[in-house]
């Protein structure tokens, strides 16, 4: 029995394209090293799972679940993350290009500014490693909620991850050091609102095929 092999998705922009918000050095390490490691470990776990399934090795199958969840979640989360970022100052970074999502945000939080403040508070309140997400509950065009997930836990269906922010230290520390608030403030300059609009209105069929 063979298992599916996952590969590192290419970035939709150059490694230095998100500067000055996220440095080229961080993007290279984050994409080529951290994301690649999740993929390597996921592929190894899937291969072990296939062998254990073929031999009906139930204890091994059980022991592999945490590795699959952690590394599979890391692959899913990062694959979504790269696509919900865009170079600063581009049309895709303008929330005007996300009319349905903007209307839903204003309806839920009163204003775009109030949403940004609430989202930032959730990100800065996250203890340890994890992610912050804007989620459409129950599917496309659902009620918007700000949620956090620990470690590499992904957003689970039927909820839709409209966009996410990586709050692991490897996402910002080389540039911002302990100024996590600076990273959170800057992230809005590179959010891909057009991509967020697409996810909000149409959902995410398969994050590993985005």
From Swiss-Prot:
Pfam families, A to Z: Sod_Fe_C, Sod_Fe_N
Cofactor stoichiometry and binding remark: Binds 1 Mn(2+) ion per subunit.
Cofactor(s) the protein needs: Mn(2+)
Protein location: Mitochondrion matrix
Domain of life assignment: Eukaryota
One Gene Ontology cellular component: mitochondrial matrix
Reactions catalysed, as given in the entry: 2 superoxide + 2 H(+) = H2O2 + O2
Annotated Mn(2+) binding sites: 30, 78, 166, 170
Record PTM text: The N-terminus is blocked.
EC number assigned by the record: 1.15.1.1
UniProt entry tagged with the keyword Oxidoreductase: yes
Chief location of this protein within or outside the cell: mitochondrion
Assigned keywords, A-Z: Antioxidant, Manganese, Metal-binding, Mitochondrion, Oxidoreductase, Transit peptide
Keyword Metal-binding included in the entry's annotation: yes
Example of a GO MF term: manganese ion binding
Family, similarity comment: Belongs to the iron/manganese superoxide dismutase family.
Function according to Swiss-Prot or TrEMBL: Destroys superoxide anion radicals which are normally produced within the cells and which are toxic to biological systems.
Subunit structure: Homotetramer.
Full protein name: Superoxide dismutase [Mn], mitochondrial
Gene source species: Penicillium chrysogenum (Penicillium notatum)
Gene of this entry: SOD
